Amino acid sequence: KPILNSVNGEEQSLATVLPLVKKYGASVVGLALDENGIPKTAEGRFEIAKRIVERAEAVGIDRKDVYIDCLTLTVSAEQAACRQTLEALHRVKTELGCKTCLGVSNISFGLPNRELVNRTFLTMAMEQGLDLPIINPNVESMTGAVRAFRVLNGIDKNSLEFINAYNDAVPAAPVKKADSNVDIFAAVYNGLKNEGAAATAKLLETTDAMQVVNEMLIPALDRVGEDFEKNKIFLPQLIQSAN
């Protein structure tokens, strides 16, 4: 779905842009400013955001299709503005239930070591409910901050995305649908509980249970332990394999 950039709290903007968004079935970015400019307070920006959401719903646009941008101001010029942006973002997320977006790099304009400031601000904003950060994806420290946040906040289940991004080890071969020793080995190694259970159940139709344990399951778990010690796999993968 396209995202139209953008509408703001000014009456002319609301009356012109929102009907187009509804007509073409798009989503829309709502800027927390109006004819008076950008409010200095979180309360002021929240009220504009609320106005945008209510007007959007009045023309039949679901609030889940409205991305509110609480606007990032340069901290070197207006240091208090950072907290106001974050507070407004939090209120939009919790009280209006909207998705949020925010440009990140403007926060550090005029400061040395801009990347450090940007990364820290990004993490603070995500903690307050930021959904769509506008960042340069080619800056590894920024994408890395997003990945780490997703792990720490329980979004990246079992840290799989993080591990795949930073683990140089070659992954084990995918499980095939044939009933062979390799299938059970790969299922255990990769922590594929359902596939491993199915392969084991099928093999038990023709093979003694102790033979399956001693010749297939134990060697697979041994390999998992060895690769964990060599830092080829990591704790979430070890736990999945054990399960």
Can you annotate each of these PLM segments?
Residues 1-65, 73-101, 105-243:
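ATP-dependent carboxylate/acyl-activation modules
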